[in-house]
A protein has these predicted regions:
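Amphipathic alpha-helical segments
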Residues: 1-16
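Long, compositionally biased, intrinsically disordered regions
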Residues: 77-84
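Intrinsically disordered, low-complexity regulatory segments enriched in Ser/Thr/Pro
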Residues: 35-68, 72
Length: 84
């Protein structure tokens, strides 16, 4: 299981997501307020993740402590309304 900090942030915000893992890299896809988001982990000499959580229409690579950075952004979002 990879991207555990990110998964915990999504659970805290009650955001439903799909998790898959391939070649040792985690992948998360989810919707929030009608927009599709992704977090796709990679290992290319360094570990990182491609994501669009900072801007729904634009992907960017995050390296270093990418799980902390991405989960921090998700936790800053408003809570989901009940029933959403």
């Amino acid at each position: 299981m990879r991207l555990e900090k990110v998964q915990e942030a999504l659970k805290t915000k009650k955001i439903h997501y799909e998790y898959t893992e391939e070649n040792g890299c985690g992948s998360i896809d989810f919707m929030f307020r009608g927009l599709r988001f992704h977090i796709w982990e990679y290992e290319d000499r360094v570990w990182g993740a491609e994501t669009n959580v900072f801007e729904a229409g634009r992907s960017q690579d995050i390296e270093g402590d990418y799980e902390k950075i991405i989960s921090g952004e998700i936790l800053s979002w408003p809570d989901m309304l009940p029933g959403m």
